[in-house]
Regions:
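Short flexible coil/turn linkers enriched for glycine and charged/polar residues
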Residues: 17, 66, 103, 141-143
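Amphipathic alpha-helical transducer elements in NTP-driven molecular machines
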Residues: 51, 55, 103, 159, ...
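Short, polar/charged loop or turn motifs at beta-strand boundaries
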Residues: 38-61, 69, 73-74, 84-89, ...
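Short acidic/polar hinge/loop motifs at secondary-structure boundaries
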Residues: 88-115, 162, 170-175
Length: 523
């Protein structure tokens, strides 16, 4: 008992381990993180259906809302662009990104206020920020080729097909998207100068094909996109209504068929060149072309008593070609049959050039910005209608009839340009005196002419215009407008830029001048 230690030699122990089947550590990914002025969302924290697009994920983000037109707001701020790994995706187009970027490739989402090109380059905040959604691609999917495709077919010949192919290596990105469906899924933003239709109206078929690229070197950044969109909408509507008047009720019934086709081509590019450490040049050209064809036909009638008290379906007796045995003859007030055709073509182009030269490394710099845009639209409408007034007799004692046969053309064009020079001088630490001058000019012109085609009873709105129609212009229906706008803006401001706040004080001088020339009819 008094022995403090004793050497017993080497003791060998046999192995008797138990192998566990598995060990699982479960943790919930944080839904949102705040880093300075950036909100960061983890894609894995939100459940979405397999094969879902970005739109489904954005709907689940806290504070995010998507309206019926596809506009996105996050915490009350409207989203202006979608970016992929810091680069604009299809020019930053919101709806194209929402409909074509699969959730499976997204690791994180960041929302922040992106500074303007001028603020980013000069380091002097000009207050022109835009809220963007920047997506980070998952590791393993940001190198080489990857893509996805979905195809579906259902009853009544409903179909949907969508594909996306991506190539990412180093600082180069390339994306190819394509889709087609007739299930009212628009899949793109639309554009051009023709009429627009809401995505839930009628039977809508859409097709889109586009390519997006981005690449950069130490001195040059280049990105752009080209996209073709097609949208066809067939809308058939039937309406019955009753109006309550002081002396009784008025009843109206109508049928309408509308078919519209719209094709658009968009091209957006951005070039940023840094020939040396003190010079930066940014050039952004854009182009779009749109073409629209629309046909519509309608039949309507007004009655002084309820037509349903006489027949089961009064809408079957609105077409003038079906009134030989008219069961509603005694209660008719008036009726109209109308057919129209609309054609339009639009082209628009714009370009922005910014040149910045740093004069030292303390914030002294001079910047030139120039912008030009041009738009041209040709809109033609052909209309034929016949209105019968059953309670107003003509000179022969029969029903009065009003015929309309018109060709309406409305060409419009506009252009504007601006030039701005800005000089910044550092006068203290993070304090700048800024001088700026800008000149802006806008011009627009519209000339509406209506031609009476009643002297051409054989003319069909789907055929070519008859010879000599130009002499049948109706002066009283003509409209002409021309607008010119001139603006000068000279300003001086003092900017204080601190880590937690910014302060700007200044004054500006803005002489403006505008001229409007308007002519309607013969006046």
């Amino acid at each position: 008992a008094n022995v403090r230690s004793k050497n017993v030699g080497t003791i060998t122990l046999e192995t008797d381990a138990i192998m566990l089947a598995e060990a699982v550590v479960v943790a919930e990914a944080p839904q949102v993180q705040v880093v300075e002025d950036t909100l960061m969302y983890s894609s894995s924290a939100y459940r979405t259906p397999e094969g879902a697009m970005l739109e489904e994920l954005v709907k689940k983000l806290p504070g995010a809302e998507i309206d019926d037109d596809g506009n996105v707001t996050i915490n009350g701020k409207e989203l202006k662009k979608i970016m992929v790994d810091g680069k604009e995706f299809f020019g930053g187009d919101i709806k194209t990104g929402l409909k074509n970027l699969p959730v499976d490739i997204i690791d994180k989402l960041k929302t922040y206020d992106k500074k303007s090109d001028l603020a980013r380059i000069t380091g002097i905040d000009d207050g022109e920020e835009e809220t963007v959604l920047d997506l980070t691609i998952k590791k393993g999917m940001n190198k080489g080729w990857f893509g996805n495709a979905d195809v579906a077919y259902g009853t009544e010949d409903r179909y949907m097909a969508r594909m996306m192919v991506n190539y990412i290596v180093d600082k180069t990105q390339f994306s190819l998207i394509g889709s087609a469906n007739n299930v009212n899924d628009q899949g793109f933003s639309g554009g051009g100068g023709g009429p627009r239709w809401r995505r839930n109206n009628g039977l809508v078929a859409t097709k889109t094909l586009g390519a997006n690229f981005a690449t950069e070197t130490s001195k040059l950044e280049l990105d752009g996109s080209v996209r073709y969109d097609y949208k066809g909408a067939d809308i058939i509507s039937t309406n019955s209504s009753e109006r309550f008047l002081q002396n009784g009720s008025s009843y109206s019934n109508s049928n309408a068929v509308n078919k519209n086709k719209n094709s658009d081509v968009f091209a957006n590019f951005r070039l940023e060149w840094k020939p040396d450490s003190m010079t930066n040049i940014i050039f952004r050209p854009n182009f779009s072309y749109g073409k629209t064809n629309g046909t519509s036909g309608s039949e309507s009638g007004t009655f002084n008593s309820d037509p349903y008290s006489l027949i089961a379906n009064p809408n079957d007796f609105l077409d003038f070609d079906k009134l030989e045995d008219d069961p509603l003859e005694n209660i008719r007030v008036n009726a109209t049959n109308d057919a129209s055709l609309t054609k339009s073509k639009s082209i628009s182009t714009s370009a922005t050039l910014q040149l910045n030269r740093k004069l030292n490394n303390r914030g002294r710099n001079i910047t030139f910005r120039g912008r030009f845009s041009y738009g041209d639209n040709d809109n033609d409408q052909y209309r034929q209608s016949e209105t019968r007034y059953y309670q107003i007799l003509n000179a022969l004692g029969g029903d009065s009839v009003l015929y309309r046969n018109q060709y309406i053309t409305t060409p419009t064009n506009n252009y504007n340009y601006s030039a701005q020079v800005t000089y910044s001088e550092p006068i203290a630490r993070a304090t700048f005196l800024q001088f700026s001058y800008q000149f802006q000019y806008k011009y627009s012109e519209s000339d509406k002419t209506t031609f009476d085609m009643l002297d051409y009873p054989e003319w069909d709105i789907n055929g070519p215009l008859p010879s000599g129609y130009e002499s049948h212009a109706v002066d009283s229906l003509g409209k002409y407008a021309e607008y010119r706008y001139y603006n000068h803006d000279a300003s001086v401001s003092l900017r204080f830029i601190r880590e937690k706040y910014q302060l700007s004080a200044g004054m500006s001088f803005q002489p403006q001048h505008s001229v409007l020339s308007y002519k309607r009819g013969d006046y």
